[in-house]
């Protein structure tokens, strides 16, 4: 009897672990879609629109004009985007300096016209309205 209960407990724990992994995988996929759409705005130099599409946390931390000026200064010297591929993606519920919540930290290996190897880190978060938005 004890052996059956122990086996059942192991099966339940394994099921819960697989379920959590699958849930995080779905969240990572949703966050990646948002990150790529957001980066396409940045690539198209639609900086004001990228600011508007960012999370509330992001918009409260950075003024729109400041964001536009920063991106113009940083992105222009890089030239046109050549390639971008996901290197890593990690689901987190806590990040340094940010409120607890749901985040996916995504690193892209990126190549630009004037910078052959770059790492871009984009962190979508689940915003208050239940939608994924870029927070940093």
Segments the model singles out, each with a brief description of its role:
Residues 88-136:
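Exposed beta-sheet edge and beta->alpha loop/turn motif
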Residues 17-46:
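Short, low-complexity N-terminal intrinsically disordered segments enriched in polar/charged residues
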Residues 8-17:
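Bacterial N-terminal signal peptides
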Residues 32-34, 48-101:
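Short solvent-exposed beta->alpha transition segments
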Residues 1-8:
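Bacterial N-terminal signal peptides that target proteins for export
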Residues 23-25, 36-40, 53-60, 110-111:
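Second-shell loop/turn segments in exported
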């Amino acid at each position: 009897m004890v052996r059956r209960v122990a086996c059942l407990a192991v099966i339940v724990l394994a099921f819960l672990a697989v379920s959590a992994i699958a849930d995080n995988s779905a969240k990572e996929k949703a966050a990646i879609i948002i990150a790529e759409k957001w980066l396409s705005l940045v690539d198209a130099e639609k900086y004001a629109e990228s600011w508007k599409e960012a999370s509330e946390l992001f918009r409260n931390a950075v003024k729109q004009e400041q964001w536009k000026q920063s991106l113009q200064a940083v992105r222009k010297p890089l030239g046109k985007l050549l390639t971008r591929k996901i290197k890593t993606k990690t689901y987190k519920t806590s990040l340094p300096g940010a409120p607890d919540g749901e985040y996916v930290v995504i690193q892209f290996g990126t190549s630009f016209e004037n910078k052959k190897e770059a790492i871009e880190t984009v962190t979508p978060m689940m915003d208050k309205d239940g939608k994924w938005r870029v927070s940093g």
